[in-house]
UniProtKB/Swiss-Prot annotation:
Keywords: mRNA processing, mRNA splicing, Nucleus. GO terms for cellular component: nucleus. This is Protein SWT21. Its main location: nucleus. It is found in: Nucleus. It comes from Zygosaccharomyces rouxii (strain ATCC 2623 / CBS 732 / NBRC 1130 / NCYC 568 / NRRL Y-229). Associates with snRNPs. InterPro entries: SWT21/TCAB1_mRNA_Telomere, WD40/YVTN_repeat-like_dom_sf, WD40_repeat_dom_sf. The keyword Nucleus applies. One of its GO terms (biological process) is mRNA processing. Involved in mRNA splicing. Helps to stabilize the U1 snRNP-5' splice site interaction. Belongs to the SWT21 family.
Length: 414
């Protein structure tokens, strides 16, 4: 079934094209027009010389504030941007509220789940970033011109090199987990530079060099379980880590794909939806049965090396973008029961359960690589669209950007 799309607000043509410096120029012009020459300026990068800027600017991640009033985006131009959802209703263009740059490529980052520009305290308005050849760092989203608030020791004592975290997840207000090479997971306090503990899976030589690629995520960016964590690796393995014993337990190895990139929990916590690279299938695992695979969801395309990120909400269920500019969905009722019908049946040909709903977004020349749904306006989502960064420069116009809109879903009409 296909659904209509309501009008939204987006970055228009700011991120279009294949020249990073021109993107910054267009963004500056949009900022000046919005602020009417107030004298305020967006932060500019201090490292433009000697870089290869003939490429598109692609969003790597999107985070909503807890009150739905703003979003934070991480882009591959080393930039971190904040956008405030307009309350005036007289503009359809997203212009950054703030923009800051790192000196190195951002491998991964994570905004504090309690972040909001309307917080009474700045303690939660922070972002963790992991970059190449740098320690893990915490930055303020309130004072984007300020220095690093804290840095965390991720150095390998054997080699003397920084180990790059590939996954970050907040456990509670003051603690977070990082995952890196050799199946290594560490728990940090925000206020200590060294880890509280470090755990490492030892499943023999075949997995000794696995990279922890993702942690399980609760809906709406809630804090993860304080007692245990599920993490995935680029070796297609899932592990359960008990925080009390710090001993990981092997759960499952998938035969399809080339590494887990996202693990989404259902609201009731009974099912885990596991996304992987280089496959068109999403694994469905039953958490009550030692994470036994019980079903699969079939995507209308095969995910490549460019990550696609989905989200789960109580209104729209599981939503994910496609490589031809659409959004596909499985209803919340289906997601809460593993997309298994009332008779306990699943798709019997091994192809996976097809989407129940498709949203036409009018972005046929671009792929929608991120869909993040608002934690307060349950039908509203922020999405990122871009060309495939793994291909050579196309002849057609490359369309990239951020778009915020409402997905109108009438599941009862299906």
């Amino acid at each position: 079934m296909y659904a209509e799309l309501k009008d939204g607000m987006g970055t228009r043509d700011v991120f279009d094209g294949w020249n990073v410096q021109k993107v910054w120029q267009k963004e500056d012009e949009a900022w000046i027009n919005r602020t009417q020459n107030s004298g305020m300026k967006l932060q500019n990068p201090a490292f433009a010389q000697g870089k290869n800027w003939e490429r598109p600017v692609i969003c790597q991640d999107i985070f909503w504030s807890r009150d739905g009033s703003s979003i934070v985006t991480i882009h591959d131009d080393y930039g971190i941007r904040q956008y405030v959802m307009s309350l005036e209703g007289n503009t359809d263009q997203l212009v950054p509220y703030s923009r800051m740059f790192k000196s190195q490529s951002i491998v991964t980052g994570r905004v504090h789940p309690l972040y909001s520009l309307y917080n009474d305290t700045e303690d939660f308005n922070v972002l963790l970033t992991a970059c190449k050849d740098l320690p893990l760092q915490m930055y303020s989203l309130q004072d984007t011109e300020g220095p690093c608030l804290n840095h965390y020791n991720v150095i390998n004592n054997e080699t003397g090199n920084w180990e790059i975290p590939h996954a970050i997840n907040w456990s509670n207000e003051d603690h977070f987990l990082i995952g890196s090479v050799k199946n290594r997971v560490s728990l940090f306090s925000c206020y200590r530079s060294s880890p509280i503990w470090t755990s490492q899976s030892k499943r023999g030589n075949s997995t000794s060099k696995s990279i922890v690629s993702c942690f399980s995520e609760r809906p709406y960016g809630e804090f993860s379980n304080a007692k245990h964590t599920i993490f995935g690796t680029y070796k297609n393995e899932l592990h359960l880590l008990d925080h009390r014993t710090q001993h990981p337990q092997f759960l499952h190895r998938s035969a399809q794909g080339r590494g887990y990139i996202q693990l989404l929990e259902s609201f009731n916590g009974h099912y885990l939806y596991a996304l992987k690279r280089n496959t068109n299938l999403i694994d469905v695992l039953d958490t009550r049965e030692s994470h036994r695979p019980v079903n699969q969801l079939q995507l209308p395309f095969t995910m490549g090396n460019q990550k696609h990120k989905a989200s789960i909400t109580s209104t729209n269920g599981l939503t994910i973008g496609t490589d031809d500019g659409k959004i596909v969905c499985w209803s919340s009722n289906a997601i809460e029961f593993g997309v298994i019908d009332r008779n306990g049946l699943t798709c019997d040909n091994g192809a996976g359960e097809k989407p129940e709903l498709t949203h036409e977004m009018g972005l046929n020349s671009s792929r929608i690589n991120i869909v993040q749904q608002s934690p307060t306006d349950f039908g509203v989502c922020a999405l990122s669209y871009s060309p495939d960064k793994m291909t050579y420069r196309p002849d057609v116009h490359a369309s990239s950007g951020i778009y915020v809109t409402e997905l109108t879903t009438d599941w009862f009409g299906l």
